[in-house]
Regions:
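Enzyme catalytic cores with a strong preference for nitrogen-chemistry domains
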Residues: 1-181
Length: 181
């Protein structure tokens, strides 16, 4: 679940943009967003402190690299907007798969760009990805959904529909088995 999280230290901004990993009615772990965009419709750095700690989520015998939206867009540190690449940092934890929670707004051909970024990350790190994108609208922004499951080679294992809510159960152990094959 995406929501703001309080920054417990007095330095920096008061809040983090965060993903809450929930299980059995409890918060298991809070993951802070690292890359805070300040272009186009985004002005996140104005409100949020960037993440500086990188840890996977341990869940039912799997290590999950949980990332928030923009955190996957700095593939291989080649984006001059950022000096850190979250997946470079998380790679040392040897995650079984990447879970990216996004609220990426619709624009013409944006789904093609997202697919390229997802494929590039899977291929670069050899790790499968579950990319979950918001669907709906918020003021003047429209979110088109189109969530994706990709294997470690970047092949699309599943794509959920655009512009409608969808629910899909994904057996992540199957993704990991494909990765090991």
């Amino acid at each position: 679940v995406g929501a703001p999280a309080r920054n417990p230290v007095k330095e920096g901004k008061d809040l983090y943009n965060a993903a809450y990993f929930l299980y059995d009615g409890k918060i298991q772990q809070v993951i802070h967003k690292t890359l805070l965009p300040t272009y186009d419709v985004f002005d996140e750095y104005r409100y949020f402190e960037p993440n500086k700690e990188f840890k996977t989520v341990q869940f039912k015998g799997q290590k999950i690299a949980v990332t928030v939206c923009e955190d996957i867009w700095n593939v291989g540190n080649d984006n001059p907007l950022y000096t850190v690449c979250p997946l470079d940092e998380l790679r040392s934890e040897q995650p079984d798969f990447i879970l990216n929670l996004s609220a990426s707004p619709f624009s013409y051909k944006q789904h093609e760009e997202r697919t390229k970024v997802i494929q590039a990350n899977c291929q670069r790190y050899g790790i499968p990805m579950v990319y979950v994108n918001q669907v709906g609208a918020q003021t003047e922004l429209v979110f088109d959904g189109g969530s994706i499951v990709a294997d470690a080679q970047g092949n699309m294992a599943k794509r959920l529909p655009f512009f409608e809510e969808a629910f899909e159960i994904i057996d992540t152990k199957d993704l990991v088995k494909e990765n090991d094959a």
